[in-house]
Regions:
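Short, solvent-exposed aromatic-acidic interface loops
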Residues: 204, 280-291
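Conserved beta-sheet core of the metallophosphoesterase superfamily
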Residues: 117-120, 212-281
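Active-site neighborhood of phospho(di)ester-bond hydrolases with catalytic His/Asp-centered motifs
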Residues: 6-8, 38-45, 73-84, 166, ...
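Active-site-proximal segments of metal-dependent phosphoesterases and phosphodiesterases across multiple
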Residues: 169-231
């Protein structure tokens, strides 16, 4: 049995009393329940961009190490994608590039899926701090995958899965809208078509598929189906959620941050490679009455 931990929306620099508690209690809970995991998946928002200070810190890197240690997963089995809060939306040239790309007034057409290289470079500038954070615990080759502005999406093949990293924050803009996003299908397809079809694929990203531009979503859904991608792991909405979209199971973890109208939730997934069965359990922090 292969097991993974899925966490999301940590917002580690936003530390109210209950948020600090639930984060501190998570490693102990995982150890006490002997939740050994082979992988840890983090679907973004390590920090809160709208809280000052909002820089990535060594304490944040140490928290990721503590989580991996609690479930017995080595750091190279930690897989992360950026969330919208991890991106500097005010990076020079980024907003202009987004306006140039978006299909309402820009050149992007989902049927072609093309984003100009010069615009990809400007979009990448918003991830410099995030990439610096990853360098605290990843080796140079791993960090290099996130630095490659010409290839914003990539896959890492493990002994058990293809872990397909998809950057759905690519054109997240200063407007804050998250219903007309796009991924650049041309670049994504170059990765998807090379997936090892002998292994299951886990797609890791920040936003649910419903956040994409309608035509982008339709075309991507078809590509995923044709290439046997069945599991979409995301976050963003600060609540655990399962959306069944035909062949695709879209699972969202909750947050590791306390809010009145949201759920601080982690997901534990299990996959039996012999009978191809998968099970996912949600654990929610109930701080007023108990632990997780």
């Amino acid at each position: 049995m292969i097991r993974w931990l899925h966490i999301s929306d940590l917002h580690l620099n936003d530390g109210n009393f209950s948020s600090a508690r639930l984060r501190d209690e998570l490693p102990s809970f995982l150890k006490d329940k002997r939740m050994k995991c082979d992988y840890v998946f983090c679907t973004g928002d390590i920090r809160s961009a709208n809280v000052r200070p909002n820089s990535f810190t060594e304490d944040m890197a140490n928290y990721m190490r503590n989580i991996c240690h609690a479930v017995g997963a080595p750091m190279e089995r930690l897989f992360i994608v950026p969330g919208n809060h991890d991106v500097n939306i005010f990076a020079e040239g980024r907003e202009d590039a987004i306006k140039h790309i978006l299909p309402y007034d820009g050149y992007y057409k989902p049927d072609y899926g093309h984003i100009d290289t010069v615009d990809l470079e400007k979009l990448q500038s918003g991830k410099e701090d995030f990439v610096g954070f990853l360098s605290e615990f990843y080796d140079t080759d791993r960090v290099g995958l996130y630095k490659d502005c010409n290839n914003p999406h990539f896959s890492i093949e493990t002994p058990d899965f293809n872990v397909l990293h998809v950057d759905t924050t690519l054109v997240y803009s200063q407007s804050g809208k998250a219903t007309d996003l796009l991924v650049g299908l041309e670049k994504l397809y170059t990765v998807v078509r090379k997936l090892n079809q002998e292994k299951p694929t886990i797609l890791l990203t920040h936003y649910p598929i419903t956040s994409l531009l309608q035509e982008e979503r339709r075309l991507l859904s078809n590509v995923l189906q044709m290439n046997n991608v069945r599991l979409w792991l995301a976050g963003h909405e600060h609540d655990h959620n399962l959306q069944k979209m035909k062949y695709l199971d879209s699972l969202q973890a909750g947050e590791l941050h306390y809010e009145t109208d949201a759920n601080a939730t982690i997901l534990i997934g299990e996959y039996d490679s012999e009978n191809y069965q998968c099970r996912v359990c949600a654990y929610t922090w109930m701080g007023r009455v108990s632990n997780y």
